[in-house]
């Protein structure tokens, strides 16, 4: 039976690279040449090549969907809106899971606070507010900013609930939030007068 000497014991065993890892010992105990080891490595790399991109469109889309879903959940919890799944058969679990996912993904901005109606999308809410209430904008419930387009509103809500959410300064009298103390000072001067605000801001 021939004797074998392990040249690189720390390398992972692979059938394509066996020639580079194990060498038959002979009387002269010659080691393999560099070219045989490189050829074995090339064979190994050819076998393990992947056609999938490391960061594909589907990965980005999945990540964005999960991020939007988390933002919406936080919005629901903050506003105290409770969603229920009515009319779902308990026997059909697939339908129930799909319905739960759809209900969870419904954005909280579809709720009109003026007439307490719920709409299918934020664009429908914007149309409703423009026609019925003559207020063609969506208002942020945290900082009271107004937005005439839903894409602007959704981008703004990421500053409150997204992964890079900003910390805001809050007015003690009306509970409005501002991104810095200068905005809060301006709010004090305009809304509450310039009375004792220096003590509160310090």
From Swiss-Prot:
Gene3D superfamilies: Classic Zinc Finger. It is found in: Nucleus. A zinc finger (C2H2-type) spans 110-133, 138-160, 169-192. Keywords: DNA-binding, Metal-binding, Nucleus, Repeat, Zinc, Zinc-finger. Residues 43-63 are annotated as: Disordered. One of its GO terms (cellular component) is nucleus. Its main location: nucleus. Coiled coil: none annotated. The keyword Zinc applies. It comes from the Eukaryota. GO terms for molecular function: DNA binding; zinc ion binding. This is Putative zinc finger protein ZK686.5. It comes from Caenorhabditis elegans.
């Amino acid at each position: 039976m021939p004797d074998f000497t392990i040249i690189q014991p720390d390398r992972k065993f692979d059938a394509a690279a066996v020639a580079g890892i194990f060498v038959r010992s002979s009387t002269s105990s010659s080691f393999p040449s560099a070219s045989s080891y490189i050829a074995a490595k090339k064979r190994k790399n050819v076998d393990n090549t992947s056609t999938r991109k490391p960061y594909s469109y589907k990965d980005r889309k999945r990540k964005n969907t999960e991020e939007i879903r988390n933002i919406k959940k936080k919005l629901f919890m903050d506003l105290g809106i409770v969603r229920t799944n009515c009319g779902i058969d308990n026997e059909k679990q697939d339908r129930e899971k799909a319905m739960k996912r759809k209900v969870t993904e419904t954005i909280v901005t579809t709720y009109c606070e003026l007439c307490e109606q719920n709409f299918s999308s934020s664009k429908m809410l914007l149309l409703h507010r423009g026609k019925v209430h003559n207020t063609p904008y969506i208002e942020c419930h945290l900082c009271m900013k107004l937005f005439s387009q839903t894409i602007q509103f959704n981008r703004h809500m990421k500053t409150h609930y997204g992964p890079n959410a900003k910390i805001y300064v809050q007015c003690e009298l009306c509970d409005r939030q501002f991104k810095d103390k200068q905005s809060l000072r301006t709010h004090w001067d305009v809304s509450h007068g310039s009375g004792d605000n220096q003590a509160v801001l310090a």
